[in-house]
Regions:
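Flavin (FAD/FMN)-binding glycine-rich loop and adjacent Rossmann-like elements that form
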Residues: 1-174
């Protein structure tokens, strides 16, 4: 399907080189993310860092809400550290922080790429690894997809680029 139309799209040359560049498992929690007009980070989802202790900070540009805790599986197998005594070490990158997040708001700008016009990314949003550990849930993606659809319709109706659609208009339609 990529021949002739999008030859730059394909499997990465440097990943899974021993398996014809195909992942061993279908389940992938995170993938590539855009660099957007805004970036969702840990302080945006954490109820204590900038929130009020019950929820993340308010964001006037929000178009979706998430509520799941920070949950990351290890990004690397066990290290070879001398601790614990078994010598196995800890799995690098494992985070299970369900008590630090409450409801948090996701701004429209995380779906709007800086480098391209005419496209929104409701799944591969502009976020840090830690923020994506909670955004990755299907209800959040559904809410972001709905917001993206509303933004696209407003962009067409108003004759403006997606980055210029007023967030208040998206919020009103949602």
């Amino acid at each position: 399907q990529t021949e002739g139309q999008s030859p730059q799209i394909g499997l990465p040359d440097d990943e899974f080189t021993d398996n014809h560049h195909l992942p061993y498992r279908l389940y992938v929690r995170q993938g590539r993310r855009i660099e957007g007009h805004e970036t969702l980070n840990e302080s945006d989802i954490h109820k204590d860092l900038r929130g009020n202790g019950l929820r993340g900070p308010l964001n006037a540009n929000s178009v979706a809400i998430g509520v799941y805790g920070i949950d990351a599986h290890n990004v690397q197998g066990p290290t070879r550290s001398p601790e614990p005594p078994s010598g196995e070490g800890a799995a690098e990158g494992t985070l299970h922080l369900f008590d630090v997040t409450g409801p948090y708001q996701i701004p429209y700008g995380v779906m709007v790429p800086k480098s391209h016009q005419g496209i929104l990314f409701p799944i591969g949003i502009s976020s840090t690894h830690v923020a994506m550990c909670t955004v990755r849930m299907e209800p959040v993606w559904a809410a972001l997809g709905q917001a993206a659809g509303v933004a696209a319709a407003l962009s067409m109706n108003q004759g403006v680029e997606l980055a210029q659609v007023p967030t208040a208009s998206i919020q009103q339609e949602l």
